[in-house]
A protein has these predicted regions:
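Short, structured segments at the rim of ligand-binding sites
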Residues: 1-277
Length: 277
């Protein structure tokens, strides 16, 4: 088990550039499957879960390589639709690949995230939504076997505004004929970022950031270049660290509109927080 040793008592002061958001890049990496081409992702954080997602893509026959904080992905040569169990166990969010693989290949097979038995859990929202689009899913024995000769758009009301389910259904709906309307969708900035990437690659999606997302599916997607959203969680962590240590920090590339809840509390506590380009 790793250990962190912190020797406190010092002011935190200086300038830091905010990395790309992990919670944006993971679904976007899954979305590259839909493009069937070459994608360049800028400001991509080199984190364990990102590397795990790359290994999943490579297991499916895709290519990926780093140039600094730029990640190049080519999914043209994708040759598989099954995610190995060992890779599924590496991160719980790996289920996000299900919708994209199903939309591209018409079938997908993977184990339950984390390798545990399926039961009442947020993944049920993913499965019920995919079934609504026309997928046949056998989820016995802890393995998901999914088939869809044809996905068809329809209105889906999520029982809970799950980020993962919203993202998974957005990906699947890109490969569905007709219009899909996701109601009670998650409204996080990372949903908007996924919409931004998909639209850059030729999709037609509106409403991300609100509780209703509309996907007009059946459009051929293509590769492209996209810059990942700055990580609001990392930015908030630096702000709170500076506040607790009595320091002063400048956050480069942070999005002030995504930090309003944190900055409001810091101002109320007596901190001086300013923003702008």
């Amino acid at each position: 088990m790793s250990r962190l040793l912190i020797r406190g008592g010092n002011r935190l002061q200086g300038e830091v550039t905010i990395q790309g958001a992990k919670n944006s890049v993971l679904p976007i990496l899954a979305a590259t499957i839909l493009t069937g081409g070459s994608v360049v992702l800028r400001r991509c954080p080199r984190l364990r879960d990102v590397e795990a997602s790359i290994r999943i893509l490579q297991a499916l026959g895709c290519k990926a390589g780093w140039r600094g904080d730029v990640l190049e992905v080519d999914t043209a040569g994708m040759s598989g639709c099954d995610v190995p169990d060992a890779l599924m166990r590496e991160m719980r969010s790996s289920v996000i690949f299900l919708g994209a693989i199903l939309a591209r290949c018409g079938e997908a097979s993977l184990t339950s995230p984390g390798g545990c038995e399926l039961g009442p859990r947020p993944i049920d929202l993913h499965l019920s939504g995919l079934r609504a689009l026309g997928a046949e899913i056998d989820d016995t024995g802890g393995t998901l076997h999914c088939k869809a000769a044809k996905l068809t758009g329809r209105e889906i009301v999520l029982g809970f505004p799950s980020v993962g389910a919203t993202e998974n259904l957005m990906l699947a709906a890109c490969g569905a004929e007709g219009v899909t309307v996701l109601s009670n969708a998650a409204r996080e900035p990372e949903i908007e970022d996924l919409q931004g990437f998909l639209n850059t690659c030729g999709a037609e999606i509106t409403g991300a950031g609100t509780s209703t997302v509309v996907i007009r599916g059946g459009r051929p997607l293509h590769g492209g270049t996209y810059t990942i959203l700055p990580d609001r969680i990392a930015a908030a962590t630096y702000l709170c660290g500076a506040a607790s240590a009595g320091g002063e920090v400048f956050l480069r590339d942070a999005r002030e509109e995504h930090l309003s809840a944190v900055t409001a509390v810091l101002r109320e506590a007596g901190c001086d927080v300013t923003g702008g380009s």
